[in-house]
Amino acid sequence: MLAFCYSLPNAGDVIKGRVYEKDYALYIYLFDYPHFEAILAESVKMHMDRYVEYRDKLVGKTVKVKVIRVDYTKGYIDVNYKRMCRHQ
């Protein structure tokens, strides 16, 4: 297990960050975890026309997201915005 494993969020945590686009996927710069970024899982699965609408709505905004998956060995964090919206 790597040293930074203890500084990553757990699945089910709600975290806050700013959305940006990179390589046709939406990522989130995490405010509480400054050395890590998370990927919005639903942005990868979308068709391009729906993705463009989704991107225009979220890029540059500060949002709360729910952590759905964490790979502690690689430092990958997958988050979901839709699940967070349903709970609010």
From Swiss-Prot:
Phenotype when changing H47R: Increased inhibition of host EIF2AK2/PKR kinase
Record keywords: Host-virus interaction, Inhibition of host innate immune response by virus, Inhibition of host interferon signaling pathway by virus, Inhibition of host PKR by virus, Interferon antiviral system evasion, RNA-binding, Viral immunoevasion
GO cellular component, as recorded: cytoplasm
UniProt site (Involved in host species specificity): K45
Segments passing through the bilayer: none
Pfam families: S1 (PF00575)
Domain S1 motif: 8-82
Gene Ontology biological-process entries: symbiont-mediated suppression of host innate immune response; symbiont-mediated suppression of host PKR/eIFalpha signaling; symbiont-mediated suppression of host type I interferon-mediated signaling pathway
Stretches the record annotates as Binding to host EIF2AK2/PKR: 43-53, 74-79
Effect of mutating D78A: Complete loss of inhibition of host EIF2AK2/PKR kinase
Gene Ontology molecular function terms on file: peptidase inhibitor activity; protein sequestering activity; protein serine/threonine kinase inhibitor activity; RNA binding
Job description of the protein: Viral mimic of EIF2S1/eIF-2alpha that acts as a pseudosubstrate for EIF2AK2/PKR kinase. Inhibits therefore EIF2S1/eIF-2alpha phosphorylation by host EIF2AK2/PKR kinase and prevents protein synthesis shutoff. Determinant of host species specificity.
Assembly with partners or alone: Interacts with host EIF2AK2/PKR kinase.
Similarity field: Belongs to the poxviridae K3 protein family.
Domain notes: The C-terminus is involved in the inhibition of host EIF2AK2/PKR kinase.
Protein's name according to its UniProt entry: Protein K3
Species of the source: Vaccinia virus (strain Western Reserve)
